[in-house]
Amino acid sequence: MNIMEEMNELLKAPIPIYSGLSGVEVKAIIKEAKLLISSRFHGVVSGLSQGVPTLCTSWSHKYVELMRDYQCEACLLDSLDGTKGVSVIDDALLNPQKYTPSKESIQHIEQKVREMWDTLL
């Protein structure tokens, strides 16, 4: 039994555990999430770009900059302060709109990406 299965057994309401999925399948699952908590850069980008309330741990400056781009600086979890992290997660579940990137910030990032590709191609 792996650590995810062990942790899942401790929950009052176990959650689905997925593995072996393609990137497209993962993105589809993220889009349906009520809340995404990720420490993987592409997972965080997927959540933010799809307007999913997204929390992340920041072990690199990339995450701080990404959250700033989406105007979601409050969505960074301090991996050294578990008590505060639990409070933020609880608040995100009760008030997801506070942790959801605005449509304007998503559109702004999408426009910047289009401009980048236009320049490159």
Identify the role of each PLM range.
Residues M1-L121:
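Active-site anion-handling motifs in enzyme catalytic cores
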